[in-house]
């Protein structure tokens, strides 16, 4: 009996197949600091530090930034050519995106007519209204659309149209193909130079006119600005410059900014004088003598305004005002206004150097006359036969208890303007007369002419002082007159 032997091969059932471990990539061999990036295949450095290996097939990226002019530090594969350009992976990606976007822009979208033709196939007519001819034409139209080839002419876009100069004299495109020297003339070198010179002179005059126009616009706008500022100042007053008291923080900041703007680029002192000289020299060099005269006249005009009209008088040297309006300059100290009188005030400027309180010629006070000529008084006959009461006695000349001697200098006789011969009151008895003469004056009448001759030379220089001292013994009741009535006196 034949036996069949079956050989059973051992199976791996129940055994765990070991998973092959993948070798971990080695890290970068950068020596300056540890780098955890994996090495490139066949290299010892990563893509970031591969340039440390001079034999590696890599070089620095050729991209240069347009902002700062620096070159990209990343590594890029070496090109086949020695002087070839190669970029890193990042800049290659950016170039691809930029190229793709540019292709999208250059490729025009579907034209409106093409879209209408494509959609017109869906516009079917109503059922029952189709005829064999219309159905035949519809079929032929569909076949025509299907046979549309890309090689046919595309519709013209706006960018592809001819751009001509609308102000040119050309009437058609064919004019560009004509001879440009068709209407040209034949000139010599001297004639060409003269023509070019005339053109340059004309161009220069046009530029000068344009510059003058700009200057006129600047002056006009400045005038409007000053007028508006004056109106605003009259309407609002000087409330902005009263001080930071009672203002909010924002208002204080605005006030500070306004003050800074007012003195922004404003020149002072020597700098202002030099700047003015520079402007005058520039205007003299550009515009000539006529402009110099105009500049001199305009710069020497007074800055004062009378009834909104500028004063046309010439200003004083080193000032901006004339002699009439010089007192409007608060910084000057050489002139003062005339005070005038109480009835008619006067504001005419007068130099301070003339006197401490200057006055104009109309209100000038004359000094007292230094020389007084001698006057021979004629005594009328009626005065010689006058009564004895006209003269005072020595007892009346003495100071009384009611009026002390210290107040005698302040007496002033009212009514001293009447014409009469000098009285013995004009002389001091204690100074000019002896004691016996005083007694004679008390008993007998005074010889007026004799006393005048005797005390003329000695008492004329002391007339004012003696008159004040002689009026001291007057009593409070007054001076006795010829009628026996007391004459009133006053204390000044």
Swiss-Prot record:
Basic and acidic residues bias locations: 135-144
Positions in coiled-coil regions: none
Keywords: Chromatin regulator, Isopeptide bond, Mitochondrion, Nucleus, Phosphoprotein, Ubl conjugation
Bias-annotated ranges (Acidic residues): 167-178
Modified residues (Phosphoserine): 147, 149, 168, 172, 175
Cross-link Glycyl lysine isopeptide (Lys-Gly) (interchain with G-Cter in SUMO2), sequence positions: 78
Required for interaction with other NSL complex members, as annotated region: 308-364
Main location: nucleus
GO cellular component entries: actin cytoskeleton; cytosol; histone acetyltransferase complex; mitochondrion; NSL complex; nucleoplasm; plasma membrane
Location in or out of the cell: Nucleus; Mitochondrion
Domain of life: Eukaryota
Region (Disordered): 126-182, 455-492
GO biological process: chromatin organization; positive regulation of DNA-templated transcription
Modification type Phosphothreonine: residues: 131
PANTHER family: KAT8 REGULATORY NSL COMPLEX SUBUNIT 2 (PTHR13453:SF1)
Function: Non-catalytic component of the NSL histone acetyltransferase complex, a multiprotein complex that mediates histone H4 acetylation at 'Lys-5'- and 'Lys-8' (H4K5ac and H4K8ac) at transcription start sites and promotes transcription initiation. Required for NSL complex stability and for transcription of intraciliary transport genes in both ciliated and non-ciliated cells by regulating histone H4 acetylation at 'Lys-5'- and 'Lys-12' (H4K5ac and H4K12ac). This is necessary for cilium assembly in ciliated cells and for organization of the microtubule cytoskeleton in non-ciliated cells.
Subunit structure: Component of the NSL complex at least composed of KAT8/MOF, KANSL1, KANSL2, KANSL3, MCRS1, PHF20, OGT1/OGT, WDR5 and HCFC1.
Name of protein: KAT8 regulatory NSL complex subunit 2
Organism: Homo sapiens (Human)
Lineage: Eukaryota, Metazoa, Chordata, Craniata, Vertebrata
């Amino acid at each position: 009996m034949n036996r069949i032997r079956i050989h059973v091969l051992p199976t791996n059932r129940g055994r765990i197949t070991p998973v092959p471990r993948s070798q971990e990539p080695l890290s970068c061999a950068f020596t300056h600091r540890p780098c955890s990036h994996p090495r490139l295949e066949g290299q010892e450095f990563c893509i970031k530090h591969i340039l440390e290996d001079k034999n590696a097939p890599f070089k620095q990226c050729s991209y240069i930034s347009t902002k700062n002019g620096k070159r990209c530090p990343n590594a890029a594969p070496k090109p086949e050519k020695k002087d070839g350009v190669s970029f890193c992976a990042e800049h290659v990606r950016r170039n691809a995106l930029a190229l793709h976007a540019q292709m999208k822009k250059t490729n025009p979208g579907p034209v409106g007519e093409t879209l209408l033709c494509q959609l017109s196939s869906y516009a079917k007519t109503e059922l029952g209204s189709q005829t064999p001819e219309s159905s035949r034409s519809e079929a032929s139209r569909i076949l025509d659309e299907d046979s549309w080839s890309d090689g046919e002419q595309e519709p013209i876009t706006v960018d592809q149209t001819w751009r001509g100069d609308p102000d040119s004299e050309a009437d058609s495109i064919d004019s560009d193909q004509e001879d440009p020297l068709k209407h040209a003339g034949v000139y010599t070198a001297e004639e060409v130079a003269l023509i070019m010179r005339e053109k340059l002179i004309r161009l220069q005059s046009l530029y000068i006119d344009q510059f003058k126009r700009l200057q006129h616009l600047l002056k006009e706008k400045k005038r409007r600005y000053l007028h508006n500022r004056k109106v605003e100042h009259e309407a609002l007053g000087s409330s902005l410059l009263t001080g930071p008291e009672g203002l909010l923080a924002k208002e204080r900041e605005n006030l500070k900014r306004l003050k800074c703007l007012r003195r922004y680029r404003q020149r002072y002192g020597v700098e202002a004088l030099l700047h003015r000289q520079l402007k005058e020299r520039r205007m003299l060099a550009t515009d000539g003598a006529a402009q110099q005269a105009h500049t001199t006249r305009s710069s020497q005009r007074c800055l004062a305004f009378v009834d909104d009209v500028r004063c046309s008088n010439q200003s004083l040297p080193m000032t901006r005002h004339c002699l009439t309006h010089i007192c409007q300059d608060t910084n000057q100290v050489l002139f003062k206004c005339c005070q005038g009188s109480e009835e008619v005030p006067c504001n005419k400027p007068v130099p301070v150097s003339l006197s401490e309180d200057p006055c104009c010629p109309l209100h000038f006070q004359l000094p007292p006359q230094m020389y007084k000529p001698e006057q021979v008084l004629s005594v009328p006959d009626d005065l010689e036969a006058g009564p004895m009461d006209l003269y005072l006695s020595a007892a009346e000349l003495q100071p009384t208890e009611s009026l002390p001697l210290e107040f005698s200098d302040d007496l002033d006789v009212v009514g001293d303007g009447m014409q009469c011969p000098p009285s013995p009151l004009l002389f001091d008895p204690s100074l000019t007369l002896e004691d016996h003469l005083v007694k004679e004056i008390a008993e007998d009448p005074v010889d007026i002419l004799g006393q005048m001759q005797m005390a003329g030379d000695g008492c004329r220089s002391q007339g004012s002082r003696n008159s004040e001292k002689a009026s001291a013994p007057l009593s409070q009741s007054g001076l006795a007159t010829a009628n026996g009535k007391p004459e009133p006196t006053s204390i000044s």
